[in-house]
Amino acid sequence: MGKELYDGFSEARDLFEQANDYFKRRISDVMFYGTEVELMRTENTQPAVFLYEVIVASIQKTFRPDVVAGHSLGEFAALVLNGTISFEDGLNLVLKRATIAQKVCEKFNTGMGAVIGLSDAYVEKRIKEIGDETGELIYFANYNGPGQVVITGSKKGIRLACKAFQRHYA
């Protein structure tokens, strides 16, 4: 994730290296060579996505929007890109957010999953059914938009729900 940007753009390379220095570890190596398991750990996912978003927008030399916006984690990239906060402040905030989320997931054995391509009503109905059938906790976390929701709950509940939704091509 992002290796072609690192190799192809000096500005991207500089931002990757700034992030590596700030995090005191090579997040770029996790992004370029990490396993799926490593990339799925929120302590890696959130900084990686933030960094990728900032880099992709930063190398767009001819595209300078008047307004930027972001949703959830994307808000931090938007704040950096519109100059509200510095890149380093964005790294700091995202690292704190990711660390807290990782600790909560580990302490409470919880997780989350994005469900894309199914109606909100169907997802809502199925997570209730799966929860009732298994006793596992499964909840809606976000309605991101039509046909895209985030569910949260016990890791087992999320796995069961994701399997059920994959059978319906989500």
Per-segment meaning from a language model:
Residues 53, 66-74, 78, 86:
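Gly/Ala-rich beta-loop-alpha elbow adjacent to hydrolase catalytic centers
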Residues 4, 11, 17, 36-38, ...:
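Glutamate identity and glutamate-enriched acidic tracts
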Residues 22-25, 82-170:
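Alpha/beta catalytic cores of group-transfer enzymes, especially the acyltransferase/condensing modules
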Residues 58-61, 79-85:
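Alpha-helix C-terminal capping segments
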Residues 1-69, 151:
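Helix-rich "cap/lid" substructures immediately adjacent to catalytic or cofactor-binding pockets
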Residues 36-37, 69-76, 98, 110-114:
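Short, glycine/charge-rich beta-strand/loop segments that flank catalytic centers
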Residues 3, 35, 71, 75, ...:
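Gly/Ser/Thr-rich helix-start
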Residues 14, 48, 72-73, 85, ...:
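An amphipathic alpha-helix/helix-turn recognition signal
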